[in-house]
Amino acid sequence: MDQGTIDGVDVAGNTIAAVCHVPGNILEGNWTAAIFVNDTASDAQEKALLKVYTGQAGGPIAELAKLIGKVVSVERAPITFDIVGAKGTLKIGTDYYAELEPYVGPSGAQTTLSDTVFSTVPGAPVFVGKAPVYRSKNAAIGIDVNLKNHNALQSTFRFEA
């Protein structure tokens, strides 16, 4: 969160992440999820973030939360993400790590899909790229993958209230 409060609790500087198993069509739901809150959040900040991201506070995030059928854990972990240009890395604890980088065209611009059903964020462009590294391991979710140079789709979104 760059800035913001939830029920009077300042949540700026905090991160929440979900690692999910999606058993089929992403929009049909029944996802299994492990939820992570950054390890520097206070108990009050964690409670406030979970209220929003589990859908209890309503709004657009509640619609997203409806897709999760089962939460197997809520954990504290270091969560880091670094973005340099259009390349980025994400690390959650010791069991999740991803690198993403875009494909670029001859002009150096990112390869973009617009007005496509392949967007995970309706109405937003999709940036096509690859994940040089993607590792994810969680026995409760049934995930244990270590992929190299796999496809990756990136998009942007912003929630404001």
What does each model-found stretch correspond to?
Residues 31, 35-124:
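Charged linear interaction tracts used for macromolecular binding and regulation
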Residues 99, 103-161:
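Extended, charged low-complexity segments
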Residues 7, 26-28, 72, 148-150:
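Residue-level signal for the start and early helices of compact helical domains
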Residues 15-19, 72-73, 137-140:
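Short amphipathic alpha-helical surface micro-motifs
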Residues 6-20, 35:
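Low-complexity, acidic/polar, glycine-enriched regions of mature
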Residues 22-25, 30-32:
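Charge-rich, amphipathic alpha-helical segments
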Residues 1-5:
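N-terminal ordered "arm"
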